[in-house]
Amino acid sequence: MATLKDQLIQNLLKEEHVPQNKITIVGVGAVGMACAISILMKDLADEVALVDVMEDKLKGEMMDLQHGSLFLRTPKIVSGKDYNVTANSRLVIITAGARQQEGESRLNLVQRNVNIFKFIIPNIVKYSPNCKLLVVSNPVDILTYVAWKISGFPKNRVIGSGCNLDSARFRYLMGERLGVHPLSCHGWILGEHGDSSVPVWSGVNVAGVSLKNLHPELGTDADKEQWKAVHKQVVDSAYEVIKLKGYTSWAIGLSVADLAESIMKNLRRVHPISTMIKGLYGIKEDVFLSVPCILGQNGISDVVKVTLTHEEEACLKKSADTLWGIQKELQF
């Protein structure tokens, strides 16, 4: 007796389903799910896989997204605790990690996350040996180094979300001050994602007009308009959002989808993201920091050589020394 499906549909060929544009997200917390919805709404993948250790939450998030399939153009959304669901991914985004406990030192948090990465990374490598790794978990620069060391991947394929969001926050705040859309406000925040990031004031411009040329005090303590406060707001903004709602999610999710788009579509756009910076700016250690990188289908193919002031370069070097101080203590 023919089934309803057989009566309705005549099959013409036996297909083997191998995804061409698969994206995996590891960790289905607030950040992971914000990445997932942002990626789904940009139609970047033909399959999205979610992985986590919390099975009920994982299944619930998967089902909730699947129920929105009519409104999306991603035909397959899967999940599992077992990494076999991640097979054949082009891009794997890692948002999983331990949350900082009150009073916990950053070094202790890092070591806890290293232990988590020691489980995650080999599983990803096993099922998607040719993927790009995009690390979002904090502290992102150190964990990108950890992912690079554990994976054995070439450095172009291990990317940290870095200062992509810091720079976006900066451009938003700059736009608010000037009454101009952030897309038309240009400015770069480089270095370590977080407290010691470096705003490159010399490059801040609208329509190619340098703000520093118009207003030489820009970004200095002598500045009557206190533009330096804009960078301080960028540094403090995550803490403020966490204090108000408990975590950050939407902006980082959108920022990650922006990076995913450059990779999946081979756009070769320039982003301030974390890459192995050894050999640049007099840095001699294996540290990952954000510099402007050309991002495409092979990950980071090139970096843009930014002209920094002596102070800016010194800040970058200081960040590198701090990171190396932590990295050399890590137990793999």
Swiss-Prot record:
<feature type="modified residue" description="N6-acetyllysine; alternate">
    <location>
        <position position="318"/>
    </location>
</feature>
<feature type="modified residue" description="N6-acetyllysine; alternate">
    <location>
        <position position="5"/>
    </location>
</feature>
<feature type="modified residue" description="N6-acetyllysine">
    <location>
        <position position="243"/>
    </location>
</feature>
<feature type="binding site">
    <location>
        <position position="138"/>
    </location>
    <ligand>
        <name>substrate</name>
    </ligand>
</feature>
<feature type="binding site">
    <location>
        <position position="106"/>
    </location>
    <ligand>
        <name>substrate</name>
    </ligand>
</feature>
<keyword id="KW-0560">Oxidoreductase</keyword>
<comment type="pathway">
    <text>Fermentation; pyruvate fermentation to lactate; (S)-lactate from pyruvate: step 1/1.</text>
</comment>
<protein>
    <recommendedName>
        <fullName>L-lactate dehydrogenase A chain</fullName>
        <ecNumber>1.1.1.27</ecNumber>
    </recommendedName>
</protein>
<feature type="modified residue" description="N6-succinyllysine; alternate">
    <location>
        <position position="118"/>
    </location>
</feature>
<feature type="modified residue" description="N6-acetyllysine">
    <location>
        <position position="81"/>
    </location>
</feature>
<dbReference type="InterPro" id="IPR018177">
    <property type="entry name" value="L-lactate_DH_AS"/>
</dbReference>
<keyword id="KW-0007">Acetylation</keyword>
<feature type="modified residue" description="Phosphotyrosine">
    <location>
        <position position="239"/>
    </location>
</feature>
<keyword id="KW-1017">Isopeptide bond</keyword>
<comment type="function">
    <text>Interconverts simultaneously and stereospecifically pyruvate and lactate with concomitant interconversion of NADH and NAD(+).</text>
</comment>
<dbReference type="GO" id="GO:0004459">
    <property type="term" value="F:L-lactate dehydrogenase activity"/>
</dbReference>
<feature type="binding site">
    <location>
        <position position="169"/>
    </location>
    <ligand>
        <name>substrate</name>
    </ligand>
</feature>
<feature type="modified residue" description="N6-succinyllysine; alternate">
    <location>
        <position position="5"/>
    </location>
</feature>
<dbReference type="GO" id="GO:0005739">
    <property type="term" value="C:mitochondrion"/>
</dbReference>
<feature type="modified residue" description="N6-succinyllysine; alternate">
    <location>
        <position position="318"/>
    </location>
</feature>
<dbReference type="InterPro" id="IPR001236">
    <property type="entry name" value="Lactate/malate_DH_N"/>
</dbReference>
<dbReference type="InterPro" id="IPR011304">
    <property type="entry name" value="L-lactate_DH"/>
</dbReference>
<feature type="modified residue" description="N6-acetyllysine">
    <location>
        <position position="232"/>
    </location>
</feature>
<feature type="modified residue" description="N6-acetyllysine; alternate">
    <location>
        <position position="118"/>
    </location>
</feature>
<feature type="active site" description="Proton acceptor">
    <location>
        <position position="193"/>
    </location>
</feature>
<feature type="modified residue" description="N-acetylalanine">
    <location>
        <position position="2"/>
    </location>
</feature>
<dbReference type="InterPro" id="IPR015955">
    <property type="entry name" value="Lactate_DH/Glyco_Ohase_4_C"/>
</dbReference>
<comment type="subunit">
    <text>Homotetramer. Interacts with PTEN upstream reading frame protein MP31.</text>
</comment>
<feature type="modified residue" description="N6-acetyllysine">
    <location>
        <position position="224"/>
    </location>
</feature>
<feature type="binding site">
    <location>
        <begin position="29"/>
        <end position="57"/>
    </location>
    <ligand>
        <name>NAD(+)</name>
    </ligand>
</feature>
<keyword id="KW-0963">Cytoplasm</keyword>
<feature type="modified residue" description="N6-acetyllysine; alternate">
    <location>
        <position position="57"/>
    </location>
</feature>
<feature type="binding site">
    <location>
        <position position="138"/>
    </location>
    <ligand>
        <name>NAD(+)</name>
    </ligand>
</feature>
<feature type="modified residue" description="Phosphothreonine">
    <location>
        <position position="309"/>
    </location>
</feature>
<dbReference type="InterPro" id="IPR036291">
    <property type="entry name" value="NAD(P)-bd_dom_sf"/>
</dbReference>
<feature type="modified residue" description="N6-acetyllysine">
    <location>
        <position position="126"/>
    </location>
</feature>
<dbReference type="Pfam" id="PF02866">
    <property type="entry name" value="Ldh_1_C"/>
</dbReference>
<dbReference type="GO" id="GO:0006089">
    <property type="term" value="P:lactate metabolic process"/>
</dbReference>
<dbReference type="InterPro" id="IPR022383">
    <property type="entry name" value="Lactate/malate_DH_C"/>
</dbReference>
<dbReference type="GO" id="GO:0006090">
    <property type="term" value="P:pyruvate metabolic process"/>
</dbReference>
<keyword id="KW-0597">Phosphoprotein</keyword>
<keyword id="KW-0520">NAD</keyword>
